[in-house]
Amino acid sequence: PIRGKIKLETYNFQDDCVKAFEDHRLNIVLKSRQLGLSTICAAYALWMALFFKNKNILVIATKFATAQNFTKKVKYALESLPKWLILPNFEYNQKEVRFDNGSKITAIPTSEDAGRSEALSLLIVDEAAFIKNFEEIWTGLNSTISRGGRAIVLSTPNGAEGQYYHLWQQAEAK
């Protein structure tokens, strides 16, 4: 950003989202741009990976650059924490952050087999309304969280059709 490093100070709606992430296993978020929700999701994923052992967190984004940006946000948040809070060793590359406690955060672009062989603690799907073949991808991903894993599916709107829209409508009806 033009102002350099910015301290993460949350807004009430962001706090509400984090509370929903904790209270509900499956979450869908309809958002506008530049609300900081991807940053909040990165911070939430980091919290889960740091404070709980053996968490497998997968982030799926529309393209590789967006996935890379997510791991950069995780790394930035991690490096901004007090030294006493950071696990002694972590590995970072453009695709993944791994921790000594067995937890990892992986961010990848969408593909039809994304995450299919994984058992996930947390699945984050960013800009889901813009993912081609999201219905097929979601069907495959759903089984990765079937043993108690959590999901956060977020997107800006992209018309009144497609799997993201269908999931949103189902959530609104509940």
Where are these regions (language model features)?
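Phosphate/NTP-binding elements of NTP-utilizing enzymes
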Residues: 1-174
